[in-house]
Regions:
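C-terminal structural segment of proteins
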Residues: 1-123
Length: 123
């Protein structure tokens, strides 16, 4: 089964790969996000996560929560909590469960902040 990330006009699409080595290494965490924010409202959002389950999966609950919500710190923090509950990553030689969870939360916040032109140092 494939995961299709649609690209819409005025949307921002970014992907992040976190691994020990950038080249030729399996990701510890991968995230692709596509969204459109209009007048501070999240009008469209797609979030795909890798490294948090057996195969890459859509973060359906986080997407559903963020859709048509005001872009603010409170909603970002709630979406991070949802991501944590939505996935149950494994511990392996690439990364621990806690590391994968924290990185996925940080990447979501980083994307949303950068998309709204707020500088971020989160990984």
């Amino acid at each position: 089964k494939e995961i299709i990330i649609p690209i819409y006009k005025k949307n921002i699409l970014k992907w992040y790969k976190i691994s020990k080595r950038i080249d030729d290494d399996i990701s510890s965490v991968f995230m692709a996000i596509n969204d459109r924010i209009e007048k501070n409202i999240i009008k469209e959002i797609k979030i795909v996560c890798g490294g948090l389950a057996e195969t890459p999966k859509i973060a359906e609950k986080a997407q559903k929560f963020l859709l048509n919500k005001i872009f603010n710190e409170e909603n970002i923090n709630e979406a991070k909590k949802i991501i944590k509950k939505e996935f149950d990553p494994i511990d392996d030689m690439r990364a621990s469960k806690n590391y994968r969870t924290k990185i996925s939360q940080n990447l979501l916040e980083r994307f949303l902040n950068e998309n709204n032109k707020i500088k971020s140092t989160l990984y």
